[in-house]
């Protein structure tokens, strides 16, 4: 309702994603989305991650990707996604990466804390950028990779740079602090 009032000339459909016929979604180059975060808590062993009541909405995004095959994806979720579920830490994120790989996407991701950009609260989010391997950007990503890609050429490199703490420990400790 708020979106419609602010953008009255935009065709907006607020249909439950579980009721959408994916074939009827218009062709698009970029799919931007997020999925509910409640099932990614690592504070409780009851959180079910990708198998939870709301966590399963990732699978709707994945189904849309399989049907529409957009060239690019930009997804967002809480940082807890990286360690979910608590009994198999990291499983859910690994599943998401594997799903995208299976659909021939290259993936770059970054955990971004709003406090690092002037906001008065710690609000860490994981952003996932994926592009088809057949795109110019995908080919470049697969060719370059490694530290150079993450620090200089990657999708997030300029706007969200990685701050290397120590040249002795290398980039691994900054990218994979867990």
Where are these regions (language model features)?
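SAM cofactor-binding core of SAM-dependent methyltransferases
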Residues: 1-19
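Redox-cofactor binding/interface segments in oxidoreductases and associated redox assembly factors
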Residues: 15, 32-33, 75
């Amino acid at each position: 309702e708020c979106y419609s009032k602010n953008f009255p000339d935009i065709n907006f459909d607020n249909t439950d994603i579980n009721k959408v016929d994916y074939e009827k979604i218009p062709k698009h180059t970029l799919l931007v989305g997020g999925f509910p975060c409640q099932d990614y808590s690592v504070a409780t062993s009851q959180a079910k991650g990708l198998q939870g009541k709301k966590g399963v909405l990732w699978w709707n995004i994945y189904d849309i990707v399989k049907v529409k095959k957009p060239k690019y994806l930009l997804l967002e979720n809480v940082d807890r996604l990286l360690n979910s579920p608590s009994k198999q830490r990291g499983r859910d994120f690994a599943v998401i990466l594997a799903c995208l790989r299976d659909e021939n996407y290259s993936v770059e991701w970054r955990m971004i804390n709003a406090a690092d950009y002037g906001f008065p609260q710690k609000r860490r989010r994981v952003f996932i950028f994926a592009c088809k391997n057949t795109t110019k950007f995908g080919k470049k990503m697969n060719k370059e990779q490694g530290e150079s890609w993450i620090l200089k050429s990657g999708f997030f490199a300029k706007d969200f740079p990685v701050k290397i703490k120590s040249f002795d420990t290398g980039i691994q400790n900054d990218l994979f602090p867990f």
